[in-house]
């Protein structure tokens, strides 16, 4: 069954990219993974809601500062959610 969630790709053992799906994290992981760019090990966190996925993605983005994430995670369309990390301009 599809669920929202967050995923982490690594390169040479270091966090390189954090992403999320508000509907189906496994499908999103499959479509986003580029063999040769990332290690074969992928970390996936399923969440109970799109909101939880967004909040977790923000926390992981700030904690790991992945080199392949150029910008802060986007707020899902139609929501006014804020980043949970204190001091972030998106909070």
Per-region residue spans from a language model:
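Boundary/linker segments flanking structured domains
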Residues: 1-15, 21-91
């Amino acid at each position: 069954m599809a669920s929202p969630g967050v995923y982490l790709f690594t390169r040479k053992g270091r966090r390189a990219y954090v992403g999320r799906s508000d509907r189906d994290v496994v499908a999103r992981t499959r479509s986003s993974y580029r063999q040769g760019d990332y290690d074969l090990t992928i970390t996936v966190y399923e969440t109970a809601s799109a909101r939880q996925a967004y909040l977790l993605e923000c926390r992981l983005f700030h904690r790991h500062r992945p080199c392949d994430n150029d910008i802060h995670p986007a707020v899902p369309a139609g929501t006014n959610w804020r980043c949970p990390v204190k001091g972030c301009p998106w909070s």
